[in-house]
Amino acid sequence: MANTEYIEFNNGIYPCPLCVAVGKDWQNDDFDDSCCREIEDDVPATTYDTYFEEKRKCVLIRFASKKAMTMEVIAHEALHATLFILGYIGSEATVYNSEPACYLLQWVVSCCEKVRLGKTE
């Protein structure tokens, strides 16, 4: 099976890139095998804390389709991605330390929205 495309985003602050892909039966040899399984019919998206391109750490959000990219689903997966990225740098979101997580969450949502709208150039 041919590699399916993904979009890589880097924000310049956190060392862990975010990758976003759309497709239920997505396959890409750049990624760990754990994230190349078909998304089940009732699951709109999945977020993976994984590695790609010769063991570089990354977070991958896979949406089953563009139709699945609703505000609710993007928000849900963006929070997973935010927590994975914070965990990678040894940080966490708390009531008393939420602002960095909020900005990171905002960035992840923005990346997903760019993919949804086809504005990734």
Language-model features: locations:
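Short, charged/polar N-terminal "headpieces" of proteins
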Residues: 1-41
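Post-HExxH zinc-binding segment in Zn-dependent metallohydrolases
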Residues: 92-121
